[in-house]
Every structure is written in C-alpha cells, then in structure tokens.
C-alpha cells in the first residue's frame, strides 16, 4: 500500500499478517508541493510511481527510497497514475492540465498517446476488459475512453447531468444481464451526488 501527503512526502506501508496496524516501510520527500498520488508498481516489486502539484510524475527505485529514476514534466499538477492491467510497460497519467497521457517505460522521452478531456483529470479507472477507461474530468464531467496500442485514446461517451459540481469519483459496478452493458457509478463533490448509469460496449 502507498500513501501520498500534502507535505510532498510519499510512503510505502506494509500490513503484516496478524497485526492490526500498518507499518511504514519507507518514506521520502517526493515532490516540492503536495503529492497527489503514489503507487507501487504491480509489475515490478522494486518500482513505484508518484505525481504532485509540482507538475512532475516520478518513477522511483524502491530499493533506495528517495532515488528518483525518472522525472516527467506535465503542464500542471499530476493527479492520477494507473498502470495498464495487462501490458507491463504501459501506464497512464492524468493532470490538472486536462490531458490523459499514455507512457511507455521503454521510451519515456514523451507520451506515446495523449487526449484532452476538457477538465482536470481526478480519477481514471480501467474496465474489466482492459479496453475502456472511466475518467472523472473535474469541471467537465465524466468520460468513457477507449484505448488500444494501435489507435491510442478515444472519447466514446460523456455523462454530466444531473451532476452540478466537480466530477470526483467514478467506478465500474459489475454488469447488467446483457453482456454488452456495464453499470457505472459516478460522484460529484459539492452537491454530494452519487449517480448510476450504464455504458454500452
């Protein structure tokens, strides 16, 4: 488990079996401003990724806390990082600069794909089929994106009303009896609203 803090620090936590509380295994100053996201890599036990309000996405070597192996600049704070569920070398970042970027760890000079969603990217969530993404785009509602290595990112569907506040959270909630439909839950901030809607695959 990983945690990010408003101080700019990130921490990796362990929860040993038969113990009630988690213990911090390592902690380090990752960003000059608030750290918005931190996660250990699902593909490498020695890697972690973080993003902060200093406009940086950073890759870390967990064998040496505080050793940044790569720092990738964005145009605004980095708020979200998700690895591809089945392709070990791909991950996505979301930012206040309103773009979703796809990165390839084998060539990190620039993103391999990018898509503007018209609002700060606060949440990204893969579908079970690994070809669709939910995106909470803050002041521009919720999106369903498609991704393939060949065509990149594409906007498939948008959902806004009755949300009237910041698009904050989104998740897939299982499926309907029809195999081509998927239930989606979205929530917005100041209006305290949770909505359920369906997406057709």
Feature annotation, model-predicted:
Residues 1, 48, 91, 133-134, ...:
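Hydrophobic beta-strand positions that form the internal "hydrophobic ladder"
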Residues 15-18, 62-65, 105-108, 148-151, ...:
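Short loop/turn segments that connect beta-strands within beta-propeller blades
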Residues 28-35, 71-78, 115-121, 159-167:
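WD40/WD-repeat beta-propeller blade N-cap
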Residues 4-7, 15, 50-54, 62, ...:
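Conserved strand-to-loop turn within each blade of WD40 beta-propeller repeats
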């Amino acid at each position: 488990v990983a945690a990010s803090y408003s101080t700019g620090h990130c921490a990796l936590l362990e929860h040993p079996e038969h113990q009630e509380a988690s213990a911090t295994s390592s902690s380090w100053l990752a960003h000059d401003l608030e750290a918005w996201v931190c996660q250990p890599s699902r593909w490498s036990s020695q890697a972690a990724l973080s993003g902060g309000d200093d406009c940086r996405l950073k890759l870390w070597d967990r064998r040496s806390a505080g050793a940044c192996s790569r720092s990738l600049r964005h145009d605004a704070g980095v708020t979200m990082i998700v690895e591809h569920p089945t392709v070990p070398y791909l991950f996505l970042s979301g930012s206040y600069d309103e773009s979703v970027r796809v990165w390839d760890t084998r060539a990190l000079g620039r993103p391999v794909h990018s898509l503007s969603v018209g609002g700060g990217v606060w949440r990204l969530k893969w579908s079970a089929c690994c070809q669709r993404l939910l995106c909470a785009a803050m002041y521009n509602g919720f999106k369903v994106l498609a991704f393939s290595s060949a065509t990149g990112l594409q906007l498939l569907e948008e959902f806004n009303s009755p949300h009237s506040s910041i698009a904050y959270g989104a998740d897939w909630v299982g499926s309907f009896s029809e195999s081509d439909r998927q239930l989606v839950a979205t929530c917005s901030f100041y209006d305290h609203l949770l909505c359920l809607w369906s997406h057709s695959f």
